[in-house]
From Swiss-Prot:
Sorted UniProt keywords: 2Fe-2S, Cytoplasm, Electron transport, Iron, Iron-sulfur, Metal-binding, Oxidoreductase, Transport
Entry-linked InterPro entries: Rieske_2Fe-2S, Rieske_2Fe-2S_sf, SDX-like
Gene it is expressed from: sdx
Localization (cell): Cytoplasm
Residues annotated for [2Fe-2S] cluster binding in this entry: C43, H45, C62, H65
Cofactor(s) in the UniProt record: [2Fe-2S] cluster
Listed NCBIfam families: SDX_Thmprot
Family: Belongs to the SDX family.
GO molecular function, one term: metal ion binding
Top-rank lineage group of the source organism: Archaea
Entry's Gene Ontology cellular component terms: cytoplasm
Entry protein name: Probable sulredoxin
Protein backbone atom coordinates (compact mmCIF):
# COMPACT_ATOMS: atom_id res chain seq x y z
CA UNK A 1 0.00 0.00 0.00
CA UNK A 2 1.16 3.49 -0.83
CA UNK A 3 -0.88 6.10 1.03
CA UNK A 4 -0.72 9.58 -0.50
CA UNK A 5 -1.83 12.77 1.25
CA UNK A 6 -4.44 14.80 -0.62
CA UNK A 7 -6.29 17.58 1.23
CA UNK A 8 -7.13 18.35 4.82
CA UNK A 9 -10.06 16.52 6.37
CA UNK A 10 -11.51 19.88 7.39
CA UNK A 11 -11.46 21.16 3.79
CA UNK A 12 -13.13 17.98 2.52
CA UNK A 13 -15.77 18.10 5.24
CA UNK A 14 -16.65 21.64 4.16
CA UNK A 15 -16.55 20.98 0.40
CA UNK A 16 -18.11 17.46 0.59
CA UNK A 17 -16.13 16.39 -2.50
CA UNK A 18 -13.08 17.28 -4.57
CA UNK A 19 -11.09 16.10 -7.56
CA UNK A 20 -7.46 15.92 -6.46
CA UNK A 21 -4.21 15.06 -8.20
CA UNK A 22 -2.53 12.01 -6.69
CA UNK A 23 0.72 11.23 -8.47
CA UNK A 24 -0.26 10.70 -12.14
CA UNK A 25 -3.99 10.26 -11.41
CA UNK A 26 -6.93 12.53 -10.70
CA UNK A 27 -9.04 11.05 -7.91
CA UNK A 28 -12.58 12.07 -6.92
CA UNK A 29 -12.90 12.02 -3.13
CA UNK A 30 -16.00 12.59 -1.04
CA UNK A 31 -17.01 12.76 2.60
CA UNK A 32 -20.66 11.85 2.98
CA UNK A 33 -21.94 11.84 6.54
CA UNK A 34 -18.48 10.89 7.81
CA UNK A 35 -17.88 8.07 5.31
CA UNK A 36 -15.00 8.60 2.89
CA UNK A 37 -15.04 7.52 -0.77
CA UNK A 38 -12.39 7.65 -3.50
CA UNK A 39 -12.51 6.72 -7.20
CA UNK A 40 -10.94 7.77 -10.48
CA UNK A 41 -12.15 11.26 -11.38
CA UNK A 42 -11.69 11.00 -15.15
CA UNK A 43 -14.83 9.79 -16.94
CA UNK A 44 -14.33 6.69 -19.07
CA UNK A 45 -16.47 8.20 -21.84
CA UNK A 46 -14.90 11.52 -22.89
CA UNK A 47 -12.17 11.95 -20.27
CA UNK A 48 -13.93 14.83 -18.49
CA UNK A 49 -13.49 15.34 -14.74
CA UNK A 50 -16.39 14.06 -12.62
CA UNK A 51 -17.88 16.78 -10.45
CA UNK A 52 -21.61 16.37 -9.74
CA UNK A 53 -22.04 14.54 -6.43
CA UNK A 54 -25.43 13.21 -5.31
CA UNK A 55 -25.00 12.56 -1.60
CA UNK A 56 -28.32 10.74 -1.20
CA UNK A 57 -27.80 8.29 -4.08
CA UNK A 58 -24.01 7.97 -3.54
CA UNK A 59 -23.37 8.75 -7.19
CA UNK A 60 -21.24 11.17 -9.17
CA UNK A 61 -22.12 12.46 -12.63
CA UNK A 62 -19.91 13.68 -15.44
CA UNK A 63 -20.89 17.16 -16.58
CA UNK A 64 -19.85 16.56 -20.22
CA UNK A 65 -22.37 13.89 -21.24
CA UNK A 66 -24.12 12.94 -17.98
CA UNK A 67 -22.52 9.52 -17.46
CA UNK A 68 -23.40 8.40 -13.92
CA UNK A 69 -21.14 6.34 -11.62
CA UNK A 70 -21.67 4.59 -8.29
CA UNK A 71 -19.34 6.19 -5.75
CA UNK A 72 -18.94 2.92 -3.80
CA UNK A 73 -18.05 0.60 -6.68
CA UNK A 74 -17.07 2.84 -9.59
CA UNK A 75 -19.65 1.04 -11.75
CA UNK A 76 -21.24 3.07 -14.52
CA UNK A 77 -24.98 3.28 -13.86
CA UNK A 78 -26.10 5.37 -16.83
CA UNK A 79 -24.48 5.71 -20.27
CA UNK A 80 -22.70 6.99 -22.30
CA UNK A 81 -20.31 4.15 -21.60
CA UNK A 82 -16.84 4.52 -23.12
CA UNK A 83 -14.90 6.60 -25.58
CA UNK A 84 -14.50 4.90 -28.99
CA UNK A 85 -10.79 4.29 -28.33
CA UNK A 86 -11.27 2.91 -24.79
CA UNK A 87 -11.14 -0.84 -24.07
CA UNK A 88 -14.63 -2.32 -23.86
CA UNK A 89 -13.95 -3.79 -20.41
CA UNK A 90 -13.38 -0.24 -19.08
CA UNK A 91 -17.03 0.45 -18.26
CA UNK A 92 -16.50 1.60 -14.69
CA UNK A 93 -13.90 3.50 -12.75
CA UNK A 94 -11.36 2.26 -10.24
CA UNK A 95 -12.09 2.84 -6.56
CA UNK A 96 -9.42 3.35 -3.90
CA UNK A 97 -9.02 2.86 -0.18
CA UNK A 98 -9.21 6.18 1.63
CA UNK A 99 -8.60 7.28 5.22
CA UNK A 100 -8.31 10.24 7.55
CA UNK A 101 -4.81 10.19 9.02
CA UNK A 102 -4.22 12.90 11.58
CA UNK A 103 -6.53 15.40 9.90
CA UNK A 104 -5.33 14.68 6.35
CA UNK A 105 -7.21 12.66 3.75
CA UNK A 106 -4.99 9.96 2.27
CA UNK A 107 -5.66 7.70 -0.71
CA UNK A 108 -3.99 4.34 -1.33
CA UNK A 109 -2.79 4.41 -4.92
Amino acid sequence: MVWKRTISAKALEKAKSAAVKVEDKVVFIANIKGTLYAMDAVCSHARCILDQLDEEKLTVKCYCHQALFDLRSGKMLEPPYVAPDAPKEKLGLKTYQIRDNGGWIEVDV
